[in-house]
Amino acid sequence: MMMGRLVFVIWLYNCLCLLLLSSLVDADQANIDCLRTFKSQVEDPNRYLSTWVFGNETAGYICKFSGVTCWHDDENRVLSIKLSGYGLRGVFPPAVKLCADLTGLDLSRNNFSGPLPANISTLIPLVTILDLSYNSFSGEIPMLISNITFLNTLMLQHNQFTGTLPPQLAQLGRLKTFSVSDNRLVGPIPNFNQTLQFKQELFANNLDLCGKPLDDCKSASSSRGKVVIIAAVGGLTAAALVVGVVLFFYFRKLGAVRKKQDDPEGNRWAKSLKGQKGVKVFMFKKSVSKMKLSDLMKATEEFKKDNIIATGRTGTMYKGRLEDGSLLMIKRLQDSQRSEKEFDAEMKTLGSVKNRNLVPLLGYCVANKERLLMYEYMANGYLYDQLHPADEESFKPLDWPSRLKIAIGTAKGLAWLHHSCNPRIIHRNISSKCILLTAEFEPKISDFGLARLMNPIDTHLSTFVNGEFGDFGYVAPEYSRTMVATPKGDVYSFGVVLLELVTGQKATSVTKVSEEKAEEENFKGNLVEWITKLSSESKLQEAIDRSLLGNGVDDEIFKVLKVACNCVLPEIAKQRPTMFEVYQLLRAIGESYNFTADDDILIPSESGEGDFIEELIVAR
């Protein structure tokens, strides 16, 4: 009898374990399906979602996707999706319903349009942060949005919402941050909890909102009388104008379509500046001839898409040719939130930062809300394009002396920023996409100091995990814990660049040719994870780019690889070397090449000065 009970208990325990395991597997698959369907439901012209590659069976692999944060790194359960400023298009993606544990959704500063789903509360019932600002969403704000009872933050500003605000919004007891400014809303503002004390600007620039904190609403009879008068006048006016409007659009239609086709996608902002062409460009070198915005427009053919050199988190870089034939690079900053006065002050500071291994900032221009920076042109473009070209058939790999020269020069420039520049600068965006090369393959670092000019960083985990101000694959792991930028974070990012130079692999993914097979094998992870695996197996030599081997410099290559490992493998940031130490190690390896001139880097004090740089020009 006792034996029978024991067998039953064991059977029941096994059944419960199998049931739990099955539910976990189903939940993982639902989250994977959520992101896969989400990706298919939106347009991604800038290919920021290219890291969303499915089919990997590794636990937690979707947690490495750009903009995605998981509850735990070793399980496919999505905590938040943050895709602000990705340039995505489409309607509100209903696929988010499959991410059942989602608590944060940020689709701000994209090109989403159309109405919000009426059943939005059933799609994201547990979300605490919902940011849909700076899009083109339209229609009425759904009444059922008030059923997302855990909402702490609701940002709907800068859209095209119409109608009235649902009075049920006042029932959101946890709401602390809220804005509906710059829409087309009318009617009374809900009677929010008085302790919230929402400011007027959170409701500003709508058609006719009223009630606290705005002006009191008028009486119903007065409103009805006003409506009658407006309707009568509007009817007479409409009757007189309707024929003219129809004819106007009839004759304009073909021209508008043709103009849209001729207008390269992405430069409408430039055409809107035609009335600002007389705006002067501030140049740091007084010897340079005076320039105006019209000169920049002409040099870039009104910032045509064909002249784009690269697009990144800080903005888009264009190639420009002046009338005298000289070339320069012009960066359009992405959503700088600084006032013109603050921006001028920052530019004056950055304009004084000069070093052989930094891209010289020649000048800047402010026109309306646009911020344009002028840089010296670099003939060999970005290091990323030299290592990972789009056309691999005509690709000629960089030889080892060129790669070592790039490594030493970049290390020297970054060490100067950390240890000798006044003010000291933490870059925060080091990658092969911010290292430009001259005609002689002399490296120059760009984007230094730009993090402070971008949108203020929030404290959300995904900001750091996914590199809001750092390219995906280069961000030091401690950001997800400390949420503080440090020089050792730059050291980690530079270590990844060194790995790219030695291996020829991309930071975000690895493609290696098997020694046993002639086919390609894909390692399921990023470059640092691959190096970590090879290091644990004592197989680091397998990581080296084969085009570099057998030329009598194998010892130098392996030494640089070891320096890179010292930068990226320690889990504790303090165990990494300083940039000054990294530079000294690389300089010693390349001593026979005579790459570097006299040092202009101050030797750090023994007090650890390099670890505690005052962040004068970094993101707040």
UniProtKB/Swiss-Prot annotation:
<dbReference type="GO" id="GO:0005886">
    <property type="term" value="C:plasma membrane"/>
</dbReference>
<keyword id="KW-0597">Phosphoprotein</keyword>
<dbReference type="InterPro" id="IPR013210">
    <property type="entry name" value="LRR_N_plant-typ"/>
</dbReference>
<keyword id="KW-0067">ATP-binding</keyword>
<feature type="modified residue" description="Phosphotyrosine">
    <location>
        <position position="479"/>
    </location>
</feature>
<feature type="glycosylation site" description="N-linked (GlcNAc...) asparagine">
    <location>
        <position position="147"/>
    </location>
</feature>
<feature type="repeat" description="LRR 2">
    <location>
        <begin position="126"/>
        <end position="148"/>
    </location>
</feature>
<keyword id="KW-0547">Nucleotide-binding</keyword>
<dbReference type="GO" id="GO:0033612">
    <property type="term" value="F:receptor serine/threonine kinase binding"/>
</dbReference>
<feature type="modified residue" description="Phosphothreonine">
    <location>
        <position position="300"/>
    </location>
</feature>
<feature type="binding site">
    <location>
        <position position="331"/>
    </location>
    <ligand>
        <name>ATP</name>
    </ligand>
</feature>
<keyword id="KW-0732">Signal</keyword>
<feature type="repeat" description="LRR 1">
    <location>
        <begin position="101"/>
        <end position="124"/>
    </location>
</feature>
<feature type="binding site">
    <location>
        <begin position="309"/>
        <end position="317"/>
    </location>
    <ligand>
        <name>ATP</name>
    </ligand>
</feature>
<dbReference type="InterPro" id="IPR001611">
    <property type="entry name" value="Leu-rich_rpt"/>
</dbReference>
<feature type="repeat" description="LRR 3">
    <location>
        <begin position="150"/>
        <end position="172"/>
    </location>
</feature>
<keyword id="KW-1003">Cell membrane</keyword>
<keyword id="KW-0325">Glycoprotein</keyword>
<dbReference type="GO" id="GO:0031348">
    <property type="term" value="P:negative regulation of defense response"/>
</dbReference>
<dbReference type="InterPro" id="IPR011009">
    <property type="entry name" value="Kinase-like_dom_sf"/>
</dbReference>
<keyword id="KW-1133">Transmembrane helix</keyword>
<feature type="modified residue" description="Phosphothreonine">
    <location>
        <position position="482"/>
    </location>
</feature>
<dbReference type="InterPro" id="IPR000719">
    <property type="entry name" value="Prot_kinase_dom"/>
</dbReference>
<keyword id="KW-0812">Transmembrane</keyword>
<feature type="glycosylation site" description="N-linked (GlcNAc...) asparagine">
    <location>
        <position position="111"/>
    </location>
</feature>
<feature type="modified residue" description="Phosphothreonine">
    <location>
        <position position="463"/>
    </location>
</feature>
<protein>
    <recommendedName>
        <fullName>Probably inactive leucine-rich repeat receptor-like protein kinase At5g48380</fullName>
    </recommendedName>
</protein>
<comment type="similarity">
    <text>Belongs to the protein kinase superfamily. Ser/Thr protein kinase family.</text>
</comment>
<feature type="repeat" description="LRR 4">
    <location>
        <begin position="174"/>
        <end position="196"/>
    </location>
</feature>
<feature type="transmembrane region" description="Helical">
    <location>
        <begin position="229"/>
        <end position="249"/>
    </location>
</feature>
<dbReference type="GO" id="GO:0042742">
    <property type="term" value="P:defense response to bacterium"/>
</dbReference>
<dbReference type="GO" id="GO:0042802">
    <property type="term" value="F:identical protein binding"/>
</dbReference>
<dbReference type="GO" id="GO:0005524">
    <property type="term" value="F:ATP binding"/>
</dbReference>
<dbReference type="InterPro" id="IPR051824">
    <property type="entry name" value="LRR_Rcpt-Like_S/T_Kinase"/>
</dbReference>
<dbReference type="GO" id="GO:0004672">
    <property type="term" value="F:protein kinase activity"/>
</dbReference>
<keyword id="KW-0677">Repeat</keyword>
<feature type="glycosylation site" description="N-linked (GlcNAc...) asparagine">
    <location>
        <position position="193"/>
    </location>
</feature>
<dbReference type="GO" id="GO:0009626">
    <property type="term" value="P:plant-type hypersensitive response"/>
</dbReference>
<feature type="glycosylation site" description="N-linked (GlcNAc...) asparagine">
    <location>
        <position position="56"/>
    </location>
</feature>
<dbReference type="Pfam" id="PF00560">
    <property type="entry name" value="LRR_1"/>
</dbReference>
<feature type="glycosylation site" description="N-linked (GlcNAc...) asparagine">
    <location>
        <position position="119"/>
    </location>
</feature>
<dbReference type="InterPro" id="IPR001245">
    <property type="entry name" value="Ser-Thr/Tyr_kinase_cat_dom"/>
</dbReference>
